[in-house]
C-alpha cells in the first residue's frame, strides 16, 4: 500500500493541529508540507495536489469543501476513489470507493468482477442497494484486511466461503 489508513490518521492529526482549513493550508510552502506528509510516500506530488486543491476550494468554492462527486473530482489529486470517500464520510452520501481490498474481495466473491476499479465500482453499484453502498464499502475493506488477504486468504475460517467464487473454484 502507498500509505495505510493508520499512517494517514497519524499524519493528518499532526498536520491539522495547525493547518485545519484551506486558508491555513496555503500558508505552508510545498517543502514545509512535504515534511508533514513525507511518511505517506509520493509526498512531492501529494503536497502539490493538497496546496492546489486548497487554493481551488478557496477560489472556486468559497472555502467550503464541495459536497458533490462531480465538484470534488475537479480538485487536484482527487480521483474517483478519494471523491467517493469524502462524499460518503464527510457528507453522508451513498458511495462505494474501490481500494485494493474492495477490488480484491469483490472479484473473489464474484459480487462484482472487473479488471479496473471503475468496472468493479459499477458492478457493486448494480449488485448492492444504493442505501447500503457506504456500509458495504466498509465491510468489504474490513473483510479484506482481516480475512481475505491478498497473499494468503483465510478461506477455511471465512464465513462467506460457501458463497465465494474464489473458494469454490479452487
Give the positions of each predicted feature.
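Catalytic cores of DNA base-excision repair glycosylases
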Residues: 1-170
